[in-house]
Amino acid sequence: MKRILTFFIFMLLAMGPGAAGAQTVVMDEGHVAFDYPDSWLVVSPQLCGVYAPLLEDAGLDADELARELEQTRTLSRAYNENYTQYLSVMIGEDELSQEIYEIENATDNQRATLRRRVEANSFWETTGLRTQDAEWQKEDGGYWLYAHYTVTRAGETVGRGLRYITVRNGLYVEMDWRIASGRFSGRDLNAFRARLADLVVTEQIAEPVRDV
């Protein structure tokens, strides 16, 4: 059985995090939905307070986490059992994403510009992220910018992450996987790429007419 979550209706409030089946999270703000592992704890800015006791047991302050998710436009995040890794769905927006609007319409120059921003660490939503490599990949006919990055604090590496970035409805839609220690294996990379099939667009918004 699948659990369908929408962070505007809060269907999750009546259900524990360990219910059977996949956790399908519908995120209206980003016009997307994503299937999280069923055993992971899913939070959003609105749900951090609901799971405050569980988060505090893991050393996470619910209010601080809610602010972080809001500031980074993280629509949802799921933690594994021991909170050593998490998956997130994020959105962003700027002039370039509005110009592209849908990734299929992106020109070579626009894709090159976005890749340069990621490589130069100017795309990231917070400081301390350092791109290790980035490349465009094509999956199911759509372009995704893949990036591998490290998380640094005071010059020390405290985590690593993988991210896929595309453009839908004028928004950057991003799927992120971060681990607190260790390195990603080739098997991890393949598994993460396969997760792209679990991220779907739920609504297509007509592109606004722009003055020439």
Residues of each region from the PLM?
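Conserved polar/disulfide-associated segments of primarily extracytoplasmic proteins
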Residues: 46-168, 173-174
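Extracytoplasmic/secreted proteins, especially bacterial periplasmic and envelope-associated proteins
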Residues: 31, 35, 109, 113, ...
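Surface-exposed amphipathic alpha-helical segments
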Residues: 40, 169-212
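Proline-anchored loop/turn motifs at beta-strand termini and strand-loop-strand connectors
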Residues: 29-50
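Bacterial N-terminal signal peptides
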Residues: 6-16
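Extracytoplasmic/periplasmic, Sec-exported soluble proteins
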Residues: 32, 79-81, 102, 106, ...
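Positively charged n-region of N-terminal signal peptides that target proteins for export
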Residues: 1-4
